[in-house]
Design a protein with these regions (language model features):
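Extended charged/polar low-complexity repeat regions
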Residues: 6-15, 25-27, 32-38, 51-53, ...
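A short, mixed-charge helix-start or loop-turn motif at secondary-structure junctions
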Residues: 56-60, 123, 131
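A structural detector for short beta-strand units
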Residues: 1-4, 12-19, 36-44, 63-71, ...
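A short glycine-rich beta-turn/N-cap micro-motif
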Residues: 1-8, 20-29, 45-54, 71-79, ...
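Short, flexible loop/turn elements at secondary-structure junctions
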Residues: 58, 134-136, 150
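Gly/Ser-enriched beta-turn/beta-hairpin loop segments
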Residues: 112-113, 119-127
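Short turn/helix-capping motifs enriched in Asx and small/polar residues
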Residues: 84-86, 91-114, 140-143, 147-149, ...
Length: 173
């Protein structure tokens, strides 16, 4: 859809993800493995289209579990909290914690108990795609998607150029 990824599969066919796009943002992600849907995520955004969390639903369940992001002043997602309950009695339980080097390379990823987890684990820390600066992280490639191009934190470079819209006067006009 308009040059946006709507599907992703790994090389051995072990899983497939489908993305539902709403405007510029991914509204929903469905993860399929072993012949069926394993979970569905619905992303939550603020009025400026910045990610603030997601709802998660497992198959054969009508219940959605909500998770909200903790961000530092730079916009890095440094924590994910699971919301339990409603209203004044709601509590927020730490589900994941992240840290990064200055270029966006993940330096640690832990579950709510503080135990290190891998990008391939079936944990909230690995499932959540929003990380450094609030960008979408692709654990298969190690790249961040910045709405129009990909950033590689290892080389500290963008892997593709910005789109160019002609003004009829060249790139300096």
């Amino acid at each position: 859809v308009n040059g946006r990824r709507t599907r992703k599969s790994n090389a051995d066919g072990g899983y497939t993800e489908y993305y539902i796009i709403d405007g510029l943002a991914v509204a929903e992600r469905r993860y399929y493995s072993g012949g069926g849907v394993q979970y569905t995520l619905r992303y939550l955004y603020d009025e400026s289209n910045n990610p603030v969390g997601f709802g998660m639903q497992y198959p054969n369940s009508t219940r959605w579990t909500n998770y909200y992001f903790e961000k530092n002043v730079q916009g890095d997602v440094i924590g994910v909290y699971q919301k339990e309950g409603d209203g004044n009695s709601a509590t927020h339980i730490l589900a994941a914690r992240y840290s990064y080097d200055p270029y966006g390379n993940p330096t640690s990823m832990t579950n709510g108990a503080g135990t290190a987890v891998s990008q391939t684990s079936n944990t909230i820390a690995a499932i959540n795609p929003f990380r450094y600066r609030g960008y979408r992280y692709d654990g298969d490639t190690g790249l961040y998607y910045l709405q129009s191009r990909y950033y590689d934190p290892v080389s500290c470079r963008f892997v593709n150029a910005d789109k160019y819209a002609s003004t009829g006067q060249g790139i300096t006009g």
